[in-house]
């Protein structure tokens, strides 16, 4: 059966008090609408239409070709928003899911269960509900004496008795697609807000003795909407807790989950230890038995097994097995460290390959370079890669020893087994098994200060 989805992402989000479009605010490193779209796709939906309004181009840039788009010029209510998808879905068969773009905690599992319940009961509409301790602001689920859905009433239209109900509508629905777009034509705006409410489609279905169902989730957090910065913070905490718990149950030790921030797409191997204050984002993959030291930050990188990282920043890089990084090192984009490499304190690496066993232990900059196996780069050594206009490459062979405070002025190639004397500035290529010394001769004038 064809499964479609409409993501509602056209609201202004004025309570966020931000120049940024509401659904583009991030939770756990990804925009809210990206979370929603990912989980909708993972629930088995074939075609997605996102309703955009304010900030439409920014949303399109974020989601790209993962979705079709319809534009809602005026925000006249949720039914009006869904109606904008007419151009893509009106003649389509199957089930259509309607999800708010500001519900980043909804899971693919719950959406899938909602769809399955809807289809198995042959319902024309199904609403996802939850029980709220404080239901203020949510539409209430009103049931009859047989516990069947009677209607959904919005907060501002509810009686005092209805406001006392604690089962609330999530704003997430599954519909028979043809029924949905047929009934949208009949929805009126005769309510306190003067808006076209999507839940009124359910009232229209029930008025004709159609089948409307409720699927209840036990996790209220899943349907949490985000309307201001306080709610954004609450969503961040809830999602981060969920992510951390999942990693811990998969065999990862997280010393202090309350100060550890891990993105939703991160993968971490068993017996890895994450110390307090760590941030791991993007599509980072970490192997087994690694130690990620406190206050480290890793973004979109591949970290091997048994790696030890201490208080360092790693971006868009690869770190091989048994390699040590830090403390206070930085791997900038394009860094590729092999196995058993050492990048020590206050070392910066950028767009460089360090082969297996290479060591850069202290206070060095290695940029646009290739460093061979087992080569040692002495303290304070620099690859001089930039002439003010262009970047040039430095190549150092295997088993070389680069003395302290050496400048390698690119483009330059240093061969295998070379020894560079400390304090040298190397501007010419050095052949294999050579000694290179490039510094001024020391002059000592004894007794000079006594004159």
Swiss-Prot record:
The keyword Metal-binding applies. GO terms for cellular component: cytoplasm; membrane. InterPro entries: Bifunctional_GlmU (IPR005882), GlmU-like (IPR050065), GlmU_C_LbH (IPR038009), Hexapep (IPR001451), Hexapep_transf_CS (IPR018357), NTP_transferase_dom (IPR005835), Nucleotide-diphossugar_trans (IPR029044), Trimer_LpxA-like_sf (IPR011004). Residues 230-250 are annotated as: Linker. Binds 1 Mg(2+) ion per subunit. It is found in: Cytoplasm. Residues 251-451 are annotated as: N-acetyltransferase. The keyword Transcription regulation does not apply. CDD domains: GT2_GlmU_N_bac (cd02540), LbH_GlmU_C (cd03353). Pathway: Nucleotide-sugar biosynthesis; UDP-N-acetyl-alpha-D-glucosamine biosynthesis; N-acetyl-alpha-D-glucosamine 1-phosphate from alpha-D-glucosamine 6-phosphate (route II): step 2/2; Nucleotide-sugar biosynthesis; UDP-N-acetyl-alpha-D-glucosamine biosynthesis; UDP-N-acetyl-alpha-D-glucosamine from N-acetyl-alpha-D-glucosamine 1-phosphate: step 1/1; Bacterial outer membrane biogenesis; LPS lipid A biosynthesis. UDP-N-acetyl-alpha-D-glucosamine binds at residues 8-11, 22, 72, 77-78, 139, 154, 227, 332, 350, 365, 376. One of its GO terms (biological process) is UDP-N-acetylglucosamine biosynthetic process. Keywords: Acyltransferase, Cell shape, Cell wall biogenesis/degradation, Cytoplasm, Magnesium, Metal-binding, Multifunctional enzyme, Nucleotidyltransferase, Peptidoglycan synthesis, Repeat, Transferase. Homotrimer. Catalyzes the last two sequential reactions in the de novo biosynthetic pathway for UDP-N-acetylglucosamine (UDP-GlcNAc). The C-terminal domain catalyzes the transfer of acetyl group from acetyl coenzyme A to glucosamine-1-phosphate (GlcN-1-P) to produce N-acetylglucosamine-1-phosphate (GlcNAc-1-P), which is converted into UDP-GlcNAc by the transfer of uridine 5-monophosphate (from uridine 5-triphosphate), a reaction catalyzed by the N-terminal domain. NCBIfam families: glmU, PRK14354.1. This is Bifunctional protein GlmU.
């Amino acid at each position: 059966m064809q499964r479609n989805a409409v993501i509602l992402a056209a609201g202004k989000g004025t309570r966020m008090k931000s120049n940024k479009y509401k659904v583009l605010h991030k939770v756990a490193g990804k925009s809210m609408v990206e979370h929603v779209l990912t989980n909708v796709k993972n629930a088995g939906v074939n075609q997605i239409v996102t309703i955009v309004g304010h900030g439409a181009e920014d949303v399109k840039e974020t989601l790209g070709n993962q979705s079709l788009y319809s534009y809602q010029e005026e925000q006249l209510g949720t039914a009006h928003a869904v109606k904008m998808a007419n151009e893509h879905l009106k003649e389509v068969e199957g089930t259509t899911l309607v999800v708010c773009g500001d519900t980043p905690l909804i899971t693919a599992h719950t959406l899938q269960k909602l769809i399955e319940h809807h289809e198995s009961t042959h319902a024309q509409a199904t609403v996802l509900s939850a029980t709220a301790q404080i239901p203020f602001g949510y539409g209430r689920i009103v049931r009859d004496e047989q516990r069947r859905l009677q209607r959904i009433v919005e907060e501002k239209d509810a009686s005092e008795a209805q406001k006392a109900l604690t089962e609330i509508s999530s704003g997430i629905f599954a519909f028979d697609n043809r029924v949905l777009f047929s009934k949208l034509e009949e929805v009126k705006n005769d309510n306190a807000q003067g808006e076209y409410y999507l839940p009124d489609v359910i009232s229209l279905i029930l008025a004709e003795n159609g089948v409307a169902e409720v699927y209840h989730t036990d996790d209220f957090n899943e349907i949490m909407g985000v309307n201001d910065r306080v709610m954004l913070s609450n969503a961040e905490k809830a999602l981060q807790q969920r992510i951390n718990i999942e990693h811990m149950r998969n065999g990862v030790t997280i010393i202090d989950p309350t100060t550890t921030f891990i993105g939703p797409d991160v993968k971490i191997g068993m017996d890895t230890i994450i110390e307090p204050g760590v941030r791991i984002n993007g599509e980072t993959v970490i192997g087994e038995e690694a130690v990620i030291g406190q206050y480290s930050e890793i973004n979109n990188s591949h970290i091997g097994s048994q790696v030890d990282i201490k208080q360092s920043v790693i971006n868009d890089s690869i770190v091989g097995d048994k390699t040590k990084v830090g403390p206070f090192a930085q791997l900038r984009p394009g860094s590729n460290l092999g196995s058993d490499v050492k990048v020590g304190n206050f070392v910066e690496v950028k767009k460089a390959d360090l082969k297996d066993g290479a060591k850069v232990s202290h206070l060095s900059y290695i940029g646009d370079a290739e460093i061979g196996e087992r080569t040692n780069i002495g303290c304070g050594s620099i690859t001089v890669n930039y002439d003010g206009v262009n970047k040039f490459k430095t190549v150092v062979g295997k088993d070389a020893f680069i003395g302290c405070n050496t400048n390698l002025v690119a483009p330059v190639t240093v061969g295998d087994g070379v020894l560079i004397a400390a304090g040298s500035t190397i501007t010419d290529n050095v052949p294999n098994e050579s000694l290179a010394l490039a510094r001024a001769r020391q002059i000592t004038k004894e007794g000079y200060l006594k004159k």
